[in-house]
Amino acid sequence: MEQAWRWYGPKDPVSLSDIRQAGATGIVTALHHIPNGEIWGIEEIKKRKTEIENAGLSWSVVESVPVHEEIKTQTGNYQKWINNYKQTLRNLAQCGIDTVCYNFMPVLDWTRTDLAYELPDGSKALRFDHIAFAAFELHILKRPDAEKTYNQEEQVAARTYYDNMSEQDIAQLTRNIIAGLPGAEEGYTLDEFQTQLDRYKDISSEKFRTHLAYFLNEIVPVAQEIGIKMAIHPDDPPRPILGLPRIVSTIEDMQWFVETQPLPANGFTMCTGSYGVRSDNDLVKMTEQFADRIYFAHLRSTQREGNPLTFHEAAHLEGDVDMFNVVKALLNEEYRRLNQGETRLIPMRPDHGHQILDDLRKKTNPGYSAIGRLKGLAEFRGLEMALKKVYFNK
């Protein structure tokens, strides 16, 4: 696999030099300074690409070209934003970039309640606490009909949790959930957040699927024509939250996805940390069944806690994910492609990482500190080497 690394551009505290020293060769990045929906111009793409190449690296994957909210709700100028998206893809292809990761999650990108959860060894991880999230919905946001989402036991627990929160706790939880995370292109106030949620109040999962299908049928033929692989990222966490529809969460969703738009350019980002939160998701089966449509891999593990809807991000080779067999399945697919004459390796990045060692004293992007990801990348490099020697005679 191609060893890649997510970089948030010139303002990222982890530099391109740091990344090269970590052993990665591919960069996963985006033009974060361009507003959602606007066209990425060729000059801006070339400028970023040149910056990366001058550091001895290559721009391997775009993560992400954001999908404008009006595309997701099919309101306002959604057709304009779709046309802009097509032009951005054409411009990327003209600059030699061939893989685009994106998501179709409404309102929020990935969601956590704690961005600095301390583990027994003193390292810090990202965590999603189901009861804390319920307290936010029920008592801070006060989302209409939120009580229908939670059973009586959960509502009582959420009330107790909220009653024990200080004003500082409330402000911190609110910021963690709605203020935007690295890679999320939107940040909201509480009122703005509810306004965004209200845009989806009449959009069921079934209707939302028709919106995704429309987007796919507009975009994927263009991607197919120009040689770009589209790799949709799953919902994170992979279940409905905040009353919003979530439609890229299970193996059934993946099957619907490829049947809806069967062109080969229509594929997946296999994010083990997102899909793996659900105990009913068999990640090895998902990887094997859709191997020929996996164009990008985020390798990360999570650990479900006593409440199975609560989880924290585990060390990369620990937790609930069968990483050994997932990586083995990815290598099987990679060798199948190579045997058929393809030369492109599957780009893989260590997704997130614990905040450890010297990074505990630094300001870092949540989940994207340097040393935790360096550790994860080294572990995956070793796992890949061992698998190749034992199973692939390489």
Swiss-Prot record:
Q: Does the keyword Iron apply?
A: yes
Q: Per the entry, which co-factors are needed?
A: Fe(2+); Mn(2+)
EC supergroup of this enzyme = lyase
Q: Enumerate the GO terms in the molecular function aspect.
A: ferrous iron binding; manganese ion binding; mannonate dehydratase activity
Please report any disulfide bonds recorded for this protein chain, giving both cysteine positions: none
Domain of life of the native organism: Bacteria
Decide whether keyword Disulfide bond is in the record: no
Q: What is its EC number?
A: 4.2.1.8
Which reaction(s) does the protein catalyse, per the Swiss-Prot or TrEMBL entry? D-mannonate = 2-dehydro-3-deoxy-D-gluconate + H2O
State the pathway, as annotated in the record.
Carbohydrate metabolism; pentose and glucuronate interconversion
Q: Which UniProt keywords apply?
A: Iron, Lyase, Manganese
Q: Which GO terms describe its biological process?
A: D-glucuronate catabolic process
Function per UniProt: Catalyzes the dehydration of D-mannonate.
Q: What does the similarity note say?
A: Belongs to the mannonate dehydratase family.
Q: Which HAMAP family match?
A: UxuA
Name of the protein in its database record: Mannonate dehydratase
Species of provenance: Haemophilus influenzae (strain ATCC 51907 / DSM 11121 / KW20 / Rd)
Q: What gene does the UniProt entry assign to this protein?
A: uxuA
